[in-house]
Amino acid sequence: MAFDPASLTYDARGLVPAIAQDHATGEVLMMAWMNAEAVARTLETGRVTYWSRSRQSFWVKGETSGHIQRLVELRIDCDRDCLLLLIEQVGPACHTHRRSCFYTAVREGAEQVFLDPMG
């Protein structure tokens, strides 16, 4: 059965959350938003394209930084309202130059940063 991005369940803004995960290690790298066109562009090019809510424009991950995300596999959750992008990440995924955007943990009631920026 052919996949149609319109078959996903989008929110009122026409967006669906997309979680980027390293395909080899399983590490969760980031979460961003996609609309139907971003999903289609990602599938067509193999380069992950998100929708920037602040800029109201497409955002090809790594287009300016060189820290690209290559799509290995796109997975859809059971409600069709969230995507899991299995990717190959080149360089850091986070704009803070960390491998993952999830670099702060709450441990024993206190926030603790456990990932340093990549050199």
Swiss-Prot record:
Residues annotated to bind Mg(2+): D77, D79, D81
Q: Where in the cell is it found?
A: Cytoplasm
Q: In which pathway does it act?
A: Amino-acid biosynthesis; L-histidine biosynthesis; L-histidine from 5-phospho-alpha-D-ribose 1-diphosphate: step 3/9
Catalytic activity from the UniProt record: 1-(5-phospho-beta-D-ribosyl)-5'-AMP + H2O = 1-(5-phospho-beta-D-ribosyl)-5-[(5-phospho-beta-D-ribosylamino)methylideneamino]imidazole-4-carboxamide
- The broad enzyme category this protein falls into is hydrolase
Q: Name one GO cellular component term.
A: cytoplasm
Cofactor(s) required, per the database record: Mg(2+); Zn(2+)
Per the UniProt entry, the Enzyme Commission number(s) are: 3.5.4.19
Q: What does this protein do?
A: Catalyzes the hydrolysis of the adenine ring of phosphoribosyl-AMP.
Q: Which PANTHER family match?
A: HISTIDINE BIOSYNTHESIS BIFUNCTIONAL PROTEIN, HISTIDINE BIOSYNTHESIS BIFUNCTIONAL PROTEIN HIS7
Give the protein name, as stated in the record.
Phosphoribosyl-AMP cyclohydrolase
Species of the source: Cereibacter sphaeroides (strain ATCC 17025 / ATH 2.4.3) (Rhodobacter sphaeroides)
